[in-house]
Amino acid sequence: MVKIRLKRAGRKKMPVYQIVVADSRSPRDGKFLEVVGHYQPTLKPHSITLKKDRVEYWMHCGAQPTATVNSLIRATGLLYELRMKKLGRSEADIATEMEKWEAAQMARREKRVTLKARRRRAKKEAEAASASSAEG
């Protein structure tokens, strides 16, 4: 069985992964058929690059992505795009849907960032209040 999975590279505590197509019986960092992308989890935000046409080709041939790679592919919007192609949508419809999807993703990221900032601010205020009450 052919899998689309991660191959670790980089140095100690600084991982960089290649997204590869490999036989499921080969070791994690062993023999592979093709490199179809890269993933850098240490960057903020994470960097994911995919050769979308090659991932689509291999998935069409029956390659199964692992759970982690599946979530990475989903994060790039490729699964959504492939689903629309499978449903028979036109290229123009797919392009407009992908623009909407990207806008929604950006809105989600912005919302997540603002929520984190609010939580940090509230936590600092609570710590300051507890410190001032402990002093007095």
Curated annotation (Swiss-Prot):
Gene Ontology terms, MF aspect: structural constituent of ribosome
GO CC terms of this entry: cytoplasm; small ribosomal subunit
Biased composition (Basic residues): 114-123
Keyword Ribonucleoprotein included in the entry's annotation: yes
Keyword annotations: Ribonucleoprotein, Ribosomal protein
SUPFAM superfamilies for this protein: Ribosomal protein S16
Taxonomy, superkingdom: Bacteria
GO terms for biological process, alphabetical: translation
Region spans: Disordered: 114-136
Record-linked InterPro entries: Ribosomal_bS16, Ribosomal_bS16_CS, Ribosomal_bS16_dom_sf
Pfam families according to UniProt: Ribosomal_S16
Entry similarity comment: Belongs to the bacterial ribosomal protein bS16 family.
HAMAP family, alphabetized: Ribosomal_bS16 (MF_00385)
Matching PANTHER family: 30S RIBOSOMAL PROTEIN S16 (PTHR12919), SMALL RIBOSOMAL SUBUNIT PROTEIN BS16M (PTHR12919:SF20)
Protein name: Small ribosomal subunit protein bS16
Naturally occurring in which organism (per UniProt): Chlorobium chlorochromatii (strain CaD3)
